[in-house]
Swiss-Prot record:
The lineage of its organism: Bacteria, Bacillati, Cyanobacteriota, Cyanophyceae, Synechococcales. Pfam families: Oxidored_nitro. The gene is chlN. GO terms for biological process: light-independent chlorophyll biosynthetic process; photosynthesis, dark reaction. It comes from Synechococcus elongatus (strain ATCC 33912 / PCC 7942 / FACHB-805). This is Light-independent protochlorophyllide reductase subunit N. Protochlorophyllide reductase is composed of three subunits; ChlL, ChlN and ChlB. Forms a heterotetramer of two ChlB and two ChlN subunits. The keyword Cytoplasm does not apply. Coiled coil: none annotated. The keyword ATP-binding applies.
Length: 466
């Protein structure tokens, strides 16, 4: 019998499996709502249309601000003129919806037939007078949430380098201040002026309540957010001047970070992501450190949040969680759950950018060591067959997985949680730590309830009889 020692450092593997994730064109689901004056045109086949219709559940009569440009046999065999067809569609969009920007979303089919969307867009943009942003979100090269990354990287190149005037810059700042002061009494508006520091851009799409919470948390430290990418309106894209600071909110935005560094000459701040009270504190502390501001009250704020989620921590303490890999949130979630007392033997992830995730990886390692649990094994592009064998051997208490594997695992008596739920939930910042544990513990609480009713015996008998 051989014994295996726990690794003293994070181990990285790549199994070169397929991308078993949601299609990245699903980014349209949240981006078209976030950018209120946009219109998304997905250029693909009927399969893409069926996916969007079913995944987003928006009925036709709701007139959503996205549409499908369905490729037909004539397009694939080059019998039709791509420019003429796209011009017809974009002219109709301009007439019916008049958006401030049209975003073309490329798919697998446009990649395979080598459709030159980047070449067609500038000519058509000049002709119809509406900006056209091209983003390739095909499932051949990108995982689920990386669709947002390609869109934001394309939009980063469109951000102005300088405000058109001092009055315009003041108006942008005042818009953020008005958002923070909405609903407050005049007396509450008297707050100390923020410290002078270089411009700070936050990039990553989050719901408006989360954006407000994070802006307020930074304002408490005397930090002013100069702009957001994406902005609520395309016409309000942030000014990105050379030397500006930028920091990401989501772990799947490595291409956007690279674009900001190389093309816009920004200084991208590397920090753990604001997931859980520990990550939120580290995220704010890193910003304060770079801007040379002394953080105030963060330790007390973190302790307060930990106390408020103690009931959920007791539920997960000592439990084992396994990440199969789907939405690139795996490392941040694993770090937070380990801090809550869970053990994580393996983290599968479709794509791993060690440079962009460097601070998060370092914090994961430090968290495991401080909690006295073995370091997880990180597997990039995992092979699902091999993963299933490891899950069968480990028998974890919970597997966080894509929807395709949830029911088969449940049929084998293994509790699961859909990773897609974390994508659409509000999970950033101090105030949403409880929401994460609410999602994670739901199957565990269900098992406890079944055990009380005697249902766990029925489940085990059903699994044994297979």
């Amino acid at each position: 019998m051989t014994t295996t020692e726990a690794p003293s450092a994070l181990s990285f593997e790549c199994e070169t499996g397929n991308y078993h994730t949601f299609c990245p064109i699903s980014c349209v689901a949240w981006l078209y709502q976030k950018i209120e004056d946009s219109f998304f045109l997905v250029i693909g086949t009927k399969t893409c249309g069926y996916f969007l219709q079913n995944a987003m559940g928006v009925m036709i009569f709701a007139e959503p601000r996205y549409a499908m440009a369905e490729l037909e046999e004539g397009d694939i065999s080059a019998q039709l003129n791509d420019y003429a067809e796209l011009k017809r569609l974009c002219t109709q969009i301009k007439r019916d919806r008049n958006p401030s920007v049209i975003v073309w979303i490329g798919t697998c089919t446009t990649e395979i037939i080598k459709m030159d969307l980047e070449g067609l867009a500038p000519k058509l943009e000049a002709e119809i007078g509406i900006p056209i942003v091209v983003a390739r979100a095909n499932g051949l090269d990108y995982a689920f949430t990386q669709g947002e990354d390609t869109v934001l990287a394309a939009m980063a190149a469109r951000c102005p380098e300088a405000a058109t005037s001092e009055a315009d810059q003041q108006e942008r700042t005042n818009a953020i201040q008005r958002l923070l002061q909405f609903g407050k009494s005049p007396a509450a508006e008297q707050q100390p002026a923020s410290s002078k520091h270089p411009p700070l851009i936050l990039f990553g799409s989050v719901p408006d309540p989360v954006a407000t919470q994070l802006t307020i948390e930074l304002a408490k430290q005397g930090i002013t957010v100069s702009g957001w990418l994406p902005a609520k309106r395309y016409t309000e894209l942030p000014v990105i001047a050379e030397g500006s600071y930028a920091i990401g909110l989501n772990p799947f935005l490595s291409r956007t970070a690279t674009t900001l560094m190389r093309r816009r000459k920004c200084k991208v701040i590397g920090a753990p992501f604001p997931i859980g009270p520990d990550g939120s504190r580290a995220w704010i502390e890193k910003i304060c450190s770079v801007l040379e501001i002394e953080p105030q009250g963060l330790a007390e704020r973190e302790a307060q949040v930990w106390d408020s989620i103690e009931d959920y921590r007791q539920l997960v303490e000592g439990k084992q969680v396994f990440f199969m890999g789907d939405n690139l949130w795996e490392i941040s979630l694993a770090r937070f759950l380990v801090r809550c007392g869970m053990r994580c033997p393996e983290i599968g992830i479709p794509y791993l950018d060690r440079r962009y995730l460097g601070a998060e990886l370092a914090m994961l390692e430090a968290t495991c060591q401080s909690m006295g649990v073995p370091l997880p094994r990180l597997v990039e592009k995992p092979d699902n067959y091999n993963q299933l064998q490891r899950i069968e051997a480990l028998q974890p208490d919970l597997v966080i997985t894509g929807m395709a594997h949830a029911n088969p695992l449940e049929a084998r008596g293994i509790s699961t949680k859909w990773s897609v739920e974390f994508t659409f939930a509000q999970i950033h910042g101090f105030g949403n730590a409880r929401a994460i544990l609410e999602l994670v513990t739901r199957p565990l609480r269900r098992n406890l309830a079944l055990g009380t009713l005697g249902g766990s015996q029925w489940v085990s008998e059903a699994v044994t009889s297979r």
